[in-house]
């Protein structure tokens, strides 16, 4: 393979074909079904599907096939089946649904407003992970352009990842013959510790998502006449959350949500911290003098990757401060996001959470806990020698730096599904979500130079597949 020719192809293809497509993609508010209950009627998902379909048809490799599956009541699935000229089966994964808008975007930016600034493309979903479909095809075409042989490649793009991938088990069964048995899974939906090297993700946390609703009255009443006698729904919610979490330390109290961290993952984390140093703290946009939960860099990374953690990500029943009258509110509803470590059974974890929140409720208040489908975490199998060599070779070629691996605190449900179904498969979990790229938050950006180099690395690794 001519590395320089590949780089020229990738750079040109990104500028001419991928960046313009991502501009159009970012404009479409294709929120995942969890954040848009009327997604079908609103039509944004179909608009993105048609954009992707039209683009793929234009750039489809010879003898390849574009397949779209759309079962009743399910989000669509887009597949690009590229026949191989050498043995092997590679599955390349990404998604085209998005997180909601989130507040706090800079004045000149917005979730549905694509803006290119300092070689970074701002807007929701470009980095997480709308680029994956386009970059995957770019990598394959770069190899074909040089007449190089590739194994069979299936590009697999879902539309409900940000909702926990509830439709994937259905499509995994429906498309089992098409998927076959992957030898290598390439996922472009993960992170990067910096923009200086090729990063691989070796583990992901799982997720228990649920809402906690506490009701004490049928309607709000004057707080002057009721407070102190009628219990506060917010205080009860606080009490219930304290069953899950030590509010002094943030430690999760429920044993079913913990696991023993393998020594090799601890060693891997120490190497990660040695590579990045204080950047593992500085990557976050701290307010004023706010401090992390621990001064130990290694322990801090383990807390966000291999330990459970609770986040309250939304609330109902609380009026905006400027419109808050002196009313004892009838209810408080909190949306909870509980990250669980790899190797924790998500169903057992969810049952333990529901039990803790529901048993013996204070004052016999009405407490309702509603859960989404729990998602399992994932820990990578041992990397084969050929893949380890290919990854490091690619990083040295296109970044002039050794590759590095890390655990991630986010969740990609499909990886756990694939790991369970295909235990002999090898995995490359990587992505462009580096420092300050802020997926899910305001000012999300795609680092274009890094994305180009990552695309080259993926092509190089595919070329070295054996």
List each model region and its residues.
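N-terminal helical capping/dimerization or prosegment-like subdomains
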Residues: 2-104, 331, 348
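Active-site metal-coordination/substrate-binding segment of hydrolases
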Residues: 87-157, 453
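Acidic, glycine-rich active-site loops and adjacent beta-strand->loop/helix elements
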Residues: 96-98, 120, 156-165, 188-193, ...
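Acidic/histidine-rich catalytic neighborhood of metal-dependent amide-processing enzymes
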Residues: 127-203
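Acidic-enriched catalytic cores of C-N bond-cleaving enzymes acting on peptides and small amides
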Residues: 178, 193, 202, 209, ...
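Short beta-strand/turn micro-motifs at beta-sheet edges
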Residues: 198-202, 321-326
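Zn-dependent metallopeptidase/amidohydrolase metal-coordination segment
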Residues: 213-215, 220-222, 237, 306, ...
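A short beta-alpha structural unit
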Residues: 338-342, 368-384, 408
């Amino acid at each position: 393979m001519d590395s320089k020719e590949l780089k020229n192809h990738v750079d040109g293809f990104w500028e001419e074909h991928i960046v313009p497509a991502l501009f159009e993609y970012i404009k479409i508010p294709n929120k995942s079904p969890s954040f848009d209950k009327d997604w079908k009627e609103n039509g944004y998902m179909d608009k993105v599907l048609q954009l992707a379909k039209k683009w793929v048809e234009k750039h489809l490799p010879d003898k390849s096939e574009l397949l779209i599956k759309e079962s009743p009541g399910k989000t669509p699935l887009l597949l690009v089946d590229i026949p191989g000229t050498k043995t092997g089966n590679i599955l390349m994964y990404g998604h085209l649904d998005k997180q909601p808008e989130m507040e706090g975007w800079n004045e000149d930016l917005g979730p549905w407003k694509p803006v290119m600034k300092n070689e970074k493309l701002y807007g929701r979903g470009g980095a997480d992970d709308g680029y994956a479909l386009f970059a995957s095809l770019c990598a394959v075409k770069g190899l074909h352009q040089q007449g190089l042989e590739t194994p069979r490649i299936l590009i697999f793009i879902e539309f409900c990842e940000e909702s926990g991938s509830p439709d994937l088990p259905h499509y995994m069964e429906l498309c089992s013959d098409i998927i076959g048995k992957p030898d290598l899974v390439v996922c472009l939906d993960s992170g990067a510790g910096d923009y200086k090297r090729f990063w691989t993700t070796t583990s992901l946390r799982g997720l228990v998502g649920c809402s906690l609703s506490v009701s004490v009255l049928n309607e709000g009443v004057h707080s002057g006449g009721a407070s102190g006698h009628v219990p506060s729904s917010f205080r009860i919610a606080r009490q219930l959350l304290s069953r899950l979490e030590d509010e002094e330390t943030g430690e999760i109290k429920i044993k079913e949500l913990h696991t023993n961290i393998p020594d090799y993952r601890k060693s891997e984390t120490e190497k990660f911290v040695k590579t990045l140093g204080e950047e593992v703290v500085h990557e976050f946009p701290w307010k004023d003098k706010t401090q992390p939960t621990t001064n130990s860099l290694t322990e801090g990374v383990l807390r966000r990757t291999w330990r459970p953690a609770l986040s309250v990500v939304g609330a109902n029943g609380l009026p905006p401060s400027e419109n808050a009258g002196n009313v004892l509110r009838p209810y408080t509803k909190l949306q909870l996001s509980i990250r669980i470590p790899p190797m924790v059974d998500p169903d057992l974890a969810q049952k333990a959470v529901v039990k803790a929140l529901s048993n013996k409720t204070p004052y016999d208040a009405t407490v309702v806990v509603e859960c989404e489908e729990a998602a399992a975490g994932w820990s990578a199998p041992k990397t084969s020698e050929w893949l380890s060599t290919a990854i490091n070779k690619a990083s040295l070629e296109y970044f002039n730096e050794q590759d590095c691996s890390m655990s991630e605190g986010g969740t990609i449900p499909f990886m756990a599904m694939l790991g369970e179904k295909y235990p002999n498969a090898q995995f490359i979990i990587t992505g462009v979500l580096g420092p300050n790229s802020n997926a899910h938050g305001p000012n999300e950006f795609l680092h274009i130079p890094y994305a180009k180099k990552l695309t080259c690395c993926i092509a190089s690794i595919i070329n070295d597949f054996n």
